[in-house]
From Swiss-Prot:
Entry keyword annotation includes tRNA-binding: yes
Signal peptide feature range: none
Entries under SUPFAM superfamilies matching the protein: Nucleic acid-binding proteins (SSF50249)
Residues recorded with modification 3-methylthioaspartic acid: 89
GO molecular function terms attached to this record: rRNA binding; structural constituent of ribosome; tRNA binding
Organism classification: Bacteria, Pseudomonadati, Pseudomonadota, Gammaproteobacteria, Moraxellales
Biological process, per Gene Ontology: translation
A GO CC term attached to the entry: small ribosomal subunit
InterPro entries: NA-bd_OB-fold, Ribosomal_uS12, Ribosomal_uS12_bac
Descriptive protein name: Small ribosomal subunit protein uS12
PANTHER family: 30S RIBOSOMAL PROTEIN S12 FAMILY MEMBER
Length: 124
């Protein structure tokens, strides 16, 4: 226990909260260029081929970003927008690509939950 005199001299040190998305640098989204587009397998109980891209951001960071939805049009040198949000079964993937923004097209034939995948309202 610190004495009153010690607290007057030094004071309590506040613990700084570590960011879960450091590459965004307190921004909601960041723009970047795909350097590699590939598939990877998830951790133990799950099985799939998850679509991931490596992105060089305008902030200078290079991060892995998950491409959600069925099918995508991304390739090397595509300009994408990324947001925070990890993928629990892919270690090291802490960002998502925003579908329907910049070079990343929205998901085709998406009827429900369209806003998350950049899909326009279908014509009746």
């Amino acid at each position: 226990m610190a004495t009153t005199n010690q607290l007057i001299r030094k004071g309590r040190k506040t613990i700084k909260e570590k960011s879960k998305v450091p590459a965004l640098e307190a921004c909601p989204q960041r723009r970047g260029v795909c350097t590699r587009v590939y598939t990877t397998t998830p951790k133990k109980p799950n099985s799939a081929m998850r679509k991931v891209c490596r992105v060089r951001l305008t902030s200078g960071y290079e991060v892995s970003s998950y491409i959600g939805g069925e099918g995508h049009n991304l390739q090397e040198h595509s300009v994408v927008l990324i947001r925070g949000g990890r993928v629990k079964d892919l270690p090291g993937v802490r960002y998502h690509t925003v579908r329907g923004a910049l070079d990343c097209a929205g998901v085709k034939d998406r009827k429900q939950g369209r806003s998350k995948y950049g899909a326009k309202k279908p014509k009746v």
